[in-house]
Amino acid sequence: MYLKNYNLKSKTAIVTGAGKGLGRACAIALAEAGANLIIISRTKKDLDEVSKKIKKLRSKCKSYVCDITNYNEIKEIINKQSKIDILINNAGNNRPAHFTKVKTKDMEYMVKINTIATFNLAHLCALKMIKSKNRKKIGGSIVNMSSQMGHVGGPIRSVYNMNKF
């Protein structure tokens, strides 16, 4: 239990990229601390597995299959929520290729998911958080996942590195 010293009961957390890896681990840790979860991923099967684990921890869980690069989809998901206390902006993508061989469509997709979608989610959640009653008293948290790769160059990760700085 990573967040054992935290009491997140009555808090609602959104985690993107929640189906696998760090997103999955974050969602489960937040549930262990008592938060209710809204999990987002592109893969229903992964979401179902994580949702089941969260519910075993006695936390409420809503799951949404969504491509976060679709602004209208994420806006609809955010607008459906009665409140948001925490955003873990974790979803991301890497399509390794040597800089001289990066395809324009791959570069544009990585920028869209790693930068634009991250901004859009943070912006939409911040607007929702600001509207909450007692916001000054209870606060809110937005965590945008980054990577050490943003500080290290590499011949096959140039676009990813640029997006993760």
Regions found by a protein language model. Name each.
Residues 12, 19-21:
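Conserved glycine-rich cofactor-binding loop
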Residues 35-49:
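Conserved glycine-rich Rossmann-like NAD(P)H-binding loop of the short-chain dehydrogenase/reductase
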Residues 45, 64-76, 104:
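The beta1-alpha1 cofactor-binding region of Rossmann-like NAD(H)/NADP(H)-dependent oxidoreductases
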Residues 98-99, 103-108:
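Substrate-binding pocket helix/loop in short-chain dehydrogenase/reductase
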